[in-house]
Amino acid sequence: GKNIYYEEAMRIPMMISWPEKIAPRRDSTLMIAFADLYPSLLSLMGFKDRIPAEVQTFDLSASILSPENTQEIAQPYYYLLPENLTTGYRGLRTKKYTFAVHATNGRTDEWILFDREQDPFQLNNIAPDQPTLIKQFSNQLKDWLKKTNDPFMNCL
């Protein structure tokens, strides 16, 4: 399944063909989540003003159109159980790090942090050795969970 924080599950290529607007054969390091497609595609089609205020994801249309306009975004990651929203994983993925937290019934029981530049195969969980980064990512994640009214925020 794809419900895991490893690169093999998260890093899925995306192809866009729009010869009038996007140069062919352009490679990009832009991180875009499936949920970002909704506001991004609406904006690209000229309906930016029609994106509902309730949309909780990112409009990445400017970054899609211009290779110079890159946004550094920590993409949220979540694996949840619909019957128990305080069990599962939540996390963030940046260009360098993968961060995830696991909780069972509202109790945090695992912290995961991988430096994908130093450990591209994600074999060494560096969370125990990086309390500053864990705190930084936890605060970012908590902000996202508050914004999305996710009860998992009480696990952090």
Model-derived features with residue positions:
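Structural micro-motif
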Residues: R11-M15, Y38
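Active-site-proximal N-terminal segment of extracellular/periplasmic enzymes that hydrolyze or transfer
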Residues: N124-T132
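C-terminal cap/loop subdomain of S1 sulfatases and analogous C-terminal strand-loop tails that border
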Residues: G1-I4, I22-P24, L30-Y38, L42-I112, ...
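Short Pro/Gly-enriched coil loops immediately N-terminal to beta-strands
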Residues: Y5-R11
